[in-house]
């Protein structure tokens, strides 16, 4: 550990000297070298300084590795959750003789939340009033507090009435879906409860806290 710190201090001192010489400020370079030496002596001789350095290193490791690992887990589980939502929508629409052609996007308020989600295509056609229309139209599915499908409305139709005919999937608890556990992929059918993945803006923090709590238990 001491050797590594000495190498880092030497590299920082060398860089500081180069910067100081480049700007014709040799005093600045000497100050950086003196600071590096004082820091090395302080780390070696004073336990309090050593403890602060260790805590800073642990915090950086936590941010870079622990939090990053939890985020990767959230990405994986969220992908499965969205795919399950899409599959559920397929089943519901099939029962109504409908299909959708579009994409799934998770949104929180007016801002999209990036979860590494696949652009899951869904086949879809508005429910025909008369004969079956073979043409499909593109629509987008948005998930906020629930997932809702709203068919396109022609100019002569009442948009509010058409929106009332949308398909709404219910929710289940956020952490049930995003707990990063072995049973995280066991989703409920759409007629029961299904999660709003974006119920909270502290998505990653909640998942991370839950993961750390299980690790400490």
Curated annotation (Swiss-Prot):
Annotated compartments: Host mitochondrion membrane
Domain of life: Viruses
Keyword terms: Host membrane, Host mitochondrion, Host-virus interaction, Membrane, Modulation of host cell cycle by virus
Residue ranges annotated as motif LXCXE motif: 141-145
Protein biosynthesis is among the record's keywords: no
Gene Ontology biological-process entries: symbiont-mediated perturbation of host cell cycle progression; symbiont-mediated transformation of host cell
GO cellular component: host cell mitochondrial membrane; membrane
Disulfide-bonded cysteines: none
Assembly with partners or alone: Interacts with host RB1; this interaction induces the cytosolic sequestration of RB1.
Role, per record: Plays a role in the modulation of host cell cycle. Induces a cytoplasmic sequestration of host RB1 at the mitochondrial membrane.
Protein name (record): Protein MC007
Natural source organism: Molluscum contagiosum virus subtype 1 (MOCV)
Lineage summary: Viruses, Varidnaviria, Bamfordvirae, Nucleocytoviricota, Pokkesviricetes
